[in-house]
Curated annotation (Swiss-Prot):
Intracellular or extracellular location(s): Virion membrane; Host cell membrane; Host Golgi apparatus, Host trans-Golgi network
Name of the protein in question: Envelope glycoprotein L
Purpose: The heterodimer glycoprotein H-glycoprotein L is required for the fusion of viral and plasma membranes leading to virus entry into the host cell. Acts as a functional inhibitor of gH and maintains gH in an inhibited form. Upon binding to host integrins, gL dissociates from gH leading to activation of the viral fusion glycoproteins gB and gH.
GO cellular component, one term: viral envelope
Cystine connections: C156-C161
Lineage: superkingdom: Viruses
Membrane topology: Peripheral membrane protein
Amino acid sequence: MMPLLLLILLSTRNLLGAAQSQESPVAGERRALDLTTVYVLPRSEPINATVEHKCREALASCYNGSEFQPLHDDGPIRPDPYRFSTMIRFKRSYGELPLPIELNDEFLEQLSLLHNNTDQLRVLLTLMRTSRASDWMSFLGGYTQCDAPKSVVFTCVESVCYEHDLMRLNYTTDLFTENVLGLDVSPPVLSVLVLLRNNHTKAESVVRVPTSSMSLLDGTYNLLRTILGHMSLDTDLIGVLRSYRDRFPAVFSVSDQIKITRQHYRPQYQRKRP
């Protein structure tokens, strides 16, 4: 429903901090949110056509304090259950030998998440991006003995099994195709909290999926800054979040043109021949 760029639904009147309006907000006054235009930060081109109207109506109902009817009884909106976020994209490993799997309570809990789970493939992809990724990669390495490529796995519910090529799945940049609960901002690590659930075994667990993309943190900062400014709320939280940005390792730097460049990269100049 919402792209990774974090869509902000704002009224055209208050989009740029009342830069186009001469009226100043009255203290304590709560204005209704007029969802006439949809914008993506930091740009300001309207993109109404890309946002489902039900999303705008739900946000307006929530913001204005009216009765809210969820779009679905449970879980996030998934127009296509076979779309997966690039956050959990399968990454092929080369030259790694299978290692013994540590059978502890954590691993057994993860097995209960997979057993007869109709969303088994999504859960498996997510687990392969957690701290127990090496265990699952070792487990999948055994498929090569059956003359199947490493990227091919089989998911089974009861006696029905399906074959999947993890390199050819329908991946999308939409982060919220997963059960995202929030962000874990703990410099030098930035993780996404994802809820995994098995309706068959009634098992559920929240896992951390590490990410090295600072665009997620920057998008969250832009989101909170705009909403708090629109509602005339205290901006101390914005200052704290901004300070977090400087506490992450200087792997990436953002230039004035909002381009991501490696900090250790230096242009090489050719010597002039005499």
